[in-house]
């Protein structure tokens, strides 16, 4: 299996961001807060929100193809349970293999689940971000704090440290 990252962008200027929401509570808010920072402070272009059918399985092929066609980079969140953290990491690997730089976000309580899925997918060194647990029960202000904390790692994983 291919464990090569897709080519990294030189900058985010004008790039379309795909946000893949896995339907877990606060996933949309976390993704949108990160996208807002990438747009306002790093020149990223439009952010497009997509929603998976079910959090516990990898993204459907049809939706994967749509996002690959429409976006330059992808951020997917939030893996804050066993099956959804594994699926979030699997999604990131699928996008990388399709040629789209991706950041998968799990919670730190499920870091090992994400790492195990990366190994199962033949990509044991796959780099993803583990946000502080919990996510689902947080207020909007707390989600914003989590997004700001995640930002340097999101940039690093995308290869455009800012």
Label the model's feature ranges.
Residues 89-112, 129:
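Short, acidic/small-residue loops that bind anionic groups at enzyme active sites
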Residues 131-162:
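A charged, well-structured terminal subsegment
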Residues 10, 15-36, 45:
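Glycine-rich phosphate/diphosphate-binding loop of Rossmann-like nucleotide-binding domains
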Residues 1-13:
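Short N-terminal or domain-adjacent regulatory/targeting segments
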Residues 54-65, 143-144:
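Structural motif
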Residues 40-53, 125-132:
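Short beta-strand elements in bilobed, periplasmic/extracellular small-molecule ligand-binding domains
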Residues 60-72, 91:
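Short, well-structured alpha-helical segments in soluble
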